[in-house]
Curated annotation (Swiss-Prot):
NCBIfam families: PRK10117.1 (NF007513), trehalose_OtsA (TIGR02400). The gene is otsA. It comes from Enterobacter sp. (strain 638). Transmembrane segments: none annotated. Gene3D superfamilies: Glycogen Phosphorylase B. One of its GO terms (molecular function) is alpha,alpha-trehalose-phosphate synthase (UDP-forming) activity. GO terms for biological process: trehalose biosynthetic process. This is Trehalose-6-phosphate synthase. It holds the Pfam family Glyco_transf_20.
Amino acid sequence: MGRLVVVSNRIAPPDDKKSSAGGLAVGILGALKTAGGLWFGWSGEVGNEDKPLQKVTRGNITWASFNLSEQDHEEYYSQFSNAVLWPAFHYRLDLVKFQRDSWEGYTRVNALLADKLLPLIEEDDILWIHDYHLLPFASELRKRGVNNRIGFFLHIPFPTPEIFTAIPPHEELLEGLCDYDLLGFQTENDRQAFLESVAGKTRLTTHNGKSHQAWGKTFDTEVYPIGIEPDEIAADASGPLPPKLAQLKNELKNVKNIFSVERLDYSKGLPERFQAYERLLEKYPQHHGKIRYTQIAPTSRGEVQAYQDIRHQLETEAGRINGRYGQLGWTPLYYLNQHFERKVLMKVFRYAEVGLVTPLRDGMNLVAKEYVAAQDPKDPGVLVLSQFAGAANELTSALLVNPYDSDDVANALDRALKMPLTERISRHAEMMKVIRENDINHWQETFIRDLKRTTPRSVESNLQKKIATFPKLA
């Protein structure tokens, strides 16, 4: 078997330290180091698009990156990927802004990237493509004669057929996805939603539950819940506190902490979370002066109106809640619209009695797993988790809540704040068992293993040709 070629919208810079890399980068680098190969993606730069591919090699891995023109970046990335696919796949059709030009830009850039990658592909390479920016990428490679094994992993949810078919070019997207040999999803619900969408548009046949045919194409589907590096997170969390954090911990020693961190995005349910916390203060006044909720939400896609709106809404809500319930010497809610280093966050997780993770819809949500892994197993905190996060399928010992029901979340927070040590230890141990079994290495190893087991298109094509030449029985 040849090299591994990874394609994603963005690549992690080759000289980034592991400590600053996110979970996806760690998983991809682990797979690349095992097989050797290439990581291909956008450099993050807009303009100077005629610049040759920028290549850097470290050991047995090569990074190859390209620039995008302003038009391509706007239509492919800002408009179609993030103003059509992202909201639709997160069940927010009210925020979808479809324009025919953006669809044309999306397909044009996928074709452009296929042209750029084509000369770099070797005969025995296997290709692993990532996420919603590149749904039609396999189709573009097939058009150019690439018969290598090509796998795809979707990091975000796949919506139900009723939602997906609202995207105007939904049929083209579905048929294009069937050009992959293996399609990986975060949850079984996502996998089934995809298959139901295909079955609604063409004849779908399934063999052994996971191998399918549609539009004359053969492909496999499977569930691969992405994981984390629990030992690395535990080490980061248990190290010495920086001076400012040590001082803050001392100041808060008589207060129980509820902690959340997510990038500022409408899919994360932040306004609903603030309302649920307010409901906790209203319904359980015994907690006044004894708890503090800290929400860290660094700005994301700040140029998009929907993101500007949610930022203003959160600032208003935080001020209103503090104005209503705050006391001299006690501010019930801290909202920080800024970025913190990942290592620092792991230390903060460890000293938070409650981790509050309540997205309205999420493919997985690694923050939930990171919070659990950062805890002291002898005195762990409690995870309050949305039932609509992919992580809820694995972390069943968390307190699962409906993020749309403020009373449900408030009741869970009250229960978490009062939970006895024995129950906290038991729930934490059960979640850690799952997190260790399905860590980031297990995720990438099982996906690559299954992709290698698929039948290459060239072999499949030759078999079909041979079958076609068999004499027909009279």
